A protein has these predicted regions:
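Phosphate/nucleotide-binding beta-alpha loop and adjacent structural elements of enzyme active sites
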Residues: 1-141
Length: 141
């Protein structure tokens, strides 16, 4: 029989972080806060009409950069941002390079997670590394 906590140590040593499930009451409280918000700006489509596309408020003039975790092999959203002068920092451990045709500000072959270790980088560490002086309201995630 394994000692208590042995499973968590085994997972941690592989760069996998296992935390206890939060109480249901906390999850319910969070779910109550999540709902659509009306924007004062019209929405514009960025990216493809299928996977990889998003409707975003047309209020991008002060945006300095995009942080895009999970790139895959295409980046239509990031390509449309670049047409507006907004470069992207990309992270994805499952691919080896930036998608063809995209000029990225940076690419890290890592998964974005809660902690920086092994094949993972914490969001805060990633942003601090590449945009240390940017304010949160100047970035897109």
């Amino acid at each position: 029989m394994q000692a208590p906590g042995h499973f968590r140590y085994d997972m941690f040593s592989q760069g996998i972080f296992v935390d206890p499930m939060p109480p249901t009451s906390r999850l319910d409280a969070l779910a109550q806060k999540l709902h659509p918000q009306q924007s004062q700006f019209p929405l514009v489509r960025m990216g493809s009409a299928a996977d990889g596309g998003y409707l975003v408020p047309d209020d991008l003039q002060d945006i300095k950069a995009c942080f895009s975790p999970g790139v895959d092999t295409f980046a239509t959203f990031e390509t449309d941002l670049l047409k507006r002068g907004i470069g992207s920092h990309l992270a994805d451990y499952s691919v080896d390079k930036v998608p063809d045709g995209l000029q990225a500000l940076s690419f890290v072959k890592k998964f974005v997670g809660g902690n920086t270790a092994g094949h993972h980088v914490a969001l805060e560490d990633w942003v601090t590394q590449f945009e240390p002086h940017a304010k949160n309201d100047e970035l897109i995630l």
